[in-house]
């Protein structure tokens, strides 16, 4: 499960369609490599959770334009202050570690 804003692209609030929204290409490449190796990569974003706007079509096209490979793309992730999960990995930690440690999870 991978977040979008602030994880694979710059975090710009409140509008995901801001033209200054830029992909983190090296992060996308790492996730695409995992996808190519057979891992399921599901993207889940809170886009629209606060505003009620449907960002699905825009988000799908944006990820396609950035070359993102995905098993699925979902909008409507709940807004929260902290995420606690036994499989959670902070994005900065994930992108600084070797994929071998992730594959064994």
Where are the predicted features?
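Catalytic phosphate/metal-binding cores of nucleic-acid and nucleotide-processing enzymes, i.e., regions
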Residues: 1-105
């Amino acid at each position: 499960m991978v977040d979008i804003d602030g994880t694979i692209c710059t975090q710009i609030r409140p509008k995901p369609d801001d033209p200054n929204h830029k992909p983190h290409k090296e992060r996308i490449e790492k996730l695409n490599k995992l996808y190519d190796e057979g891992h399921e990569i599901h993207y889940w974003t809170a886009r629209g959770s606060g505003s009620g706007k449907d960002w699905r079509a825009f988000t799908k096209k944006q990820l396609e334009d950035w070359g993102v490979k995905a098993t699925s793309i979902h909008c409507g992730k709940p807004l929260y202050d902290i995420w606690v999960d036994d499989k959670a990995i902070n994005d900065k930690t994930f992108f600084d570690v070797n994929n071998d440690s992730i594959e064994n999870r």
